[in-house]
Amino acid sequence: MNKIILFTITLLLQGGLCFGQKPVSVSSKAAGEKFEHFWSKSVGAGRANEGLRAGWLEQLEKVQQNCGFEYVRFHGIFHDDMFPIFEKDGKYTYNWQYIDDLFDRMLDLNVRPFVELAFFPTPLAAENSKTQFWWKANITPDESKYDEWYNLVQAFTQHCVDRYGIDEVLTWYFEVWNEPNLYYGFFDGTKSQYFELYKQSVLAVRSVDERLKVGGPSSSNFVADGRYDGEVESRDGDLITFTADNINDLEWKGSWIVDFLEYCEKEELPVDFISTHPYPTDYPFNPNTGKGKDFSRYVNSTKDDMEWLNEVIKNSAYPTAEIHLTEWNTSPNSRDAMHDFLPPAAYIAKVNLDCIGLANSLAFWTFTDIFEEKGGGESIFHGGFGMINYQGLVKPSYHAYRMLHQLGDEKIYHNDYLFVSRKSGDGKIVALAYNYPEDHYNAVPSSIKKIDQHKNGKSRSLDFNLSDLKSGTMFKIEVLDWESGNIYDYWEQMGKPEPPTREQIKVMKNYAENLDTDLVSADENGEVSFQRTLAPWSLVLIEQVN
């Protein structure tokens, strides 16, 4: 049966898509189920050198304070612009000044590095290495220099322990490379060469302390065909997906995950965590014509991918390995206009709440538009990944993470549009309502379709009653919708100033950060009702304040 139809029937049976929903009644004293805020464990950024900029650090401080992110992951810790290694007369010396500067500043902001061991510094790359991005990340391995790679990773790890202490570094994660399955993207080598690189890396890190956490393979999006089954990516394998009548009918699998686990078992190598990037998209090529297609999968695809991954790990030699999904967004395109709009906020809320318990982290890619894989943005809103733009204007995606962070740590109710939680420390209730319209379930929002199409969608009625409160208990209600917190439309109404003046930036920041709010209180019976229409893609945070 078509997954969309099956998914829709299930929700209809649960009452989840009945847009004249029955009232929901929840007792504030109801038994709660503990859960982890896996959405705030880690967040992504572009490359290490960008983290030395004042604006990047200011924005990191903001998302740490308001969204609770504990780790940040980025590319290029060993890239030439961090100057980690010098070669003279055939001898290597190491230089950690730039990395120290970055890590020191991050730790001062209470954010730890989720260390991605990449890319090759020029002295350790293959001669005439292929490069990625305008900043020329070296991606071609030279196996004759793997011993020197081992030495670099070992020296780097030892330096981190010496500088920050073993107790601190034991909390870090060391991930080997980024998306090595993308032969045309990030690793100009074979699957076997990556596996050997992982071996050298994990042995180097563990030589410093066997308790340090190392993982991989940091592979790209899930696929429904065999393009990554061989030693290098084969575009002949895309045809199944390219010609599918409905991509959501296909069976999707993680890239290189099974082979990686089998290799590590055979070589008796540690695997402390599995990492991969479950973007809900695919870009298959027709091998006969060379033409590509842009696909967005259905809304529940990320959950499907996580469930597949949990099953594979459970049946592997590493059943206790953590799961860190080190990149995720509505798409992996840093010029996808949808990233600046409202719909991703509802998607972020829905997916994270639906996937509680399925991963240790789901890292949004990225927290900032200070991000230069395709160079600087040509406009202040250019479809960048970031939840904050270059000028420091927060987007709806930022508010989604801020609202998720406000939730408690005990779940007391959850359906397809409402999550009610309690804070175990003080017993306060925090609820999040959201409307991901059912008429958009078949594809995650992206600019593959016109943006205007996503302004349409079914509204939803919220009729929610809380009981067993003290009389007078106050709740603050915050609304994120097309009229409140939707900074792109506000900028458009201002005439799209490019670049905006300093005064215009202040005005836009005030609008973007201050959502429409209201206050309600429990009656003399200790009850309070929340009744409103949820516009398509909107979020409503209901937070007890006393």
Task: Please identify what each model-predicted range represents.
Residues 22-158, 165-171, 175-176, 181, ...:
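N-terminal substrate-binding region of glycoside hydrolase catalytic domains
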Residues 4-14:
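Sec-dependent N-terminal signal peptides
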Residues 18-20:
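Boundary at the C-terminal end of the N-terminal hydrophobic targeting segment
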Residues 42, 106, 156, 174, ...:
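Conserved, mostly hydrophobic/aromatic
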Residues 324-450:
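Aromatic/acidic polysaccharide-binding cleft in carbohydrate-active enzymes
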Residues 434-546:
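C-terminal beta-sandwich/jelly-roll accessory domains of carbohydrate-active enzymes
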Residues 191-354, 358, 380:
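Noncatalytic carbohydrate-binding groove/subsite architecture in carbohydrate-active enzymes
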